[in-house]
Amino acid sequence: MTNISLDKLVTESRNENTKDIDRVETLEMLKMINDEDKKVAEAVEKELIHIAKAVDKIGESFLNGGRLIYVGAGTSGRLGVLDASECPPTYGVSYDLVRGIIAGGESAMFKAREGAEDSKKLCIKDLKNINFGKNDILVGIAASGRTPYVIGGLEYANGIGATTISVTCNPESEMSKIANISIAPVVGPEAITGSTRMKAGTAQKMVLNMLSTGAMVKTGKVYGNLMVDLKATNEKLVERAKRIVMQATGSKREQVEKILKETNFDVKLSIFMIESSLDKIKAKEILDKNKGYIVEAIKEIS
């Protein structure tokens, strides 16, 4: 257990702006919370340089067969699992490429297991269970920057030569000193003292969104701002797939539906077939040669 005193942590400080939150009308209470929330995006903005470095590292790892692994406890762990679980349907990647690990295991997603965060060895065990390797990226998430579970994971990852990234909301935290890249949006004291599921959690969610989205953009999963590798696994996504191809190519619905049927709803391949006027086999060959980057594939045939 780390010996950092809680009274030195920004996230545990008392917020003078909300000290009367229990004595005001509902609307005023919500305005207080909203005013605090407005500070989050600005805090994240100050960390963009560090976030960019992290995105570049993650994208490079993906291209070299590595994975993105989030570890955290409590709210931080849940946010990692949430971000990871959205990557396969959005970008068509395997469930193994981006993974979230929460202290205490799957049951901790639904019921707090606070004691699990106090063990460094538990995180090391969890990482070994997924065969975490030096080509993978470890992102340790903890508002305080002092959670033993996460620190144990970062130390282990450093020890095997993997790239480590910390996402915290306290400046100069222990985690930030251990990680290769430190991302620390300082959002200030919470509206409810110590309730880091609020501003800190929001900041962490924004950062994780940037990390995964940025890496997917860097690895050709996006064309323009369209998610061209999505998996059309339900009616909503089937319709979205059609709209994406229409938006990307300017084609009529009838043509798009025909091409999507031919490609078994491979959105990226459908777009490139229309843009290139190539048949499916040739289009796939060129697309694969260019590692799925539509822009690069189009350049090759121009």
From Swiss-Prot:
Molecular function, one GO term: carbon-oxygen lyase activity
InterPro entries: Etherase_MurQ, Glucokinase_regulatory_CS, MURQ/GCKR, SIS_dom, SIS_dom_sf
Enzyme nomenclature, EC number: 4.2.1.126
Reaction equation(s) it catalyzes: N-acetyl-D-muramate 6-phosphate + H2O = N-acetyl-D-glucosamine 6-phosphate + (R)-lactate
Subunit-structure text: Homodimer.
Family label: Belongs to the GCKR-like family. MurNAc-6-P etherase subfamily.
Designated name of the protein: N-acetylmuramic acid 6-phosphate etherase
